[in-house]
């Protein structure tokens, strides 16, 4: 039985509606899949950027922390240096004060004579030369001469050797030093400095650990004494 034109048109419309519906469903499926893939990619990009930002700020935080440590270390070192300078300045002031007090010793002639006797004899024992020359300040010449005269027989008895000791009257020690003597061997190549300043410096070096301990207390980090 042949289909009428109306039936044919009806079937065509039905087929077109089916095709259109299928096309719409396919398009919706594609859109949904594309949106899903977009959301996944967007999430991945967001996560990647978030990780990069976190990594950047973690790196910055570490750099800032490192800079803080360096600055703190520098500040501590500067503070430590200031303390050390202050300590050295205090010790220097004490030594300068001690040097100024040496002039009081020299003014006491009796006390100064005893001191010169010891310095001259000690210098002779240190050199142990057959001929020695003593230098002193011009104003100390009489006292040093007396000290040499006392020292020669004591030296001879102790060493069982003769000795010729002369006082240099051509080249005296500077008048601005506190006092004491310098003793040379015969050709002046060897010298023993027994001026009051040199003796004070020597004593200061030997007693520096005790001085620091008395002024500032013991240093727990110091393994050896100066």
UniProtKB/Swiss-Prot annotation:
Chief location bin = membrane
Subcellular compartments: Apical cell membrane; Cytoplasmic vesicle, Secretory vesicle, Synaptic vesicle membrane; Cytoplasmic vesicle, Clathrin-coated vesicle membrane
Q: How does it sit in the membrane?
A: Peripheral membrane protein
Q: Does the keyword Calcium apply?
A: no
Q: Which residues carry this modification: Phosphotyrosine?
A: 56
Could you tell me in which tissues this protein is expressed?
Kidney; localizes to early distal nephron, encompassing thick ascending limbs and distal convoluted tubules (at protein level). Ubiquitous. High expression in the skin.
User: N-acetylalanine: which positions carry it?
Assistant: 2
The signal peptide annotation in the UniProt record is none
User: What cellular-component terms does GO give this entry?
Assistant: apical plasma membrane; clathrin-coated vesicle membrane; cytosol; endosome; extracellular exosome; lysosomal membrane; microvillus; proton-transporting two-sector ATPase complex
Give any GO molecular function from the UniProt entry: proton-transporting ATPase activity, rotational mechanism
The biological processes this protein is annotated with in GO are:
proton transmembrane transport; regulation of macroautophagy; synaptic vesicle lumen acidification
Keywords per UniProt: Acetylation, Cell membrane, Cytoplasmic vesicle, Disease variant, Hydrogen ion transport, Ion transport, Membrane, Phosphoprotein, Synapse, Transport
State what this protein does.
Subunit of the V1 complex of vacuolar(H+)-ATPase (V-ATPase), a multisubunit enzyme composed of a peripheral complex (V1) that hydrolyzes ATP and a membrane integral complex (V0) that translocates protons. V-ATPase is responsible for acidifying and maintaining the pH of intracellular compartments and in some cell types, is targeted to the plasma membrane, where it is responsible for acidifying the extracellular environment.
Q: How does it assemble?
A: V-ATPase is a heteromultimeric enzyme made up of two complexes: the ATP-hydrolytic V1 complex and the proton translocation V0 complex. The V1 complex consists of three catalytic AB heterodimers that form a heterohexamer, three peripheral stalks each consisting of EG heterodimers, one central rotor including subunits D and F, and the regulatory subunits C and H. The proton translocation complex V0 consists of the proton transport subunit a, a ring of proteolipid subunits c9c'', rotary subunit d, subunits e and f, and the accessory subunits ATP6AP1/Ac45 and ATP6AP2/PRR.
What protein family does this chain belong to? Belongs to the V-ATPase E subunit family.
Record disease entry = Cutis laxa, autosomal recessive, 2C: A form of cutis laxa, a disorder characterized by an excessive congenital skin wrinkling, a large fontanelle with delayed closure, a typical facial appearance with downslanting palpebral fissures, and a general connective tissue weakness. Most ARCL2C patients exhibit severe hypotonia as well as cardiovascular involvement.
Tell me the protein's name.
Answer: V-type proton ATPase subunit E 1
Which species? Homo sapiens
Source taxonomy: Eukaryota, Metazoa, Chordata, Craniata, Vertebrata
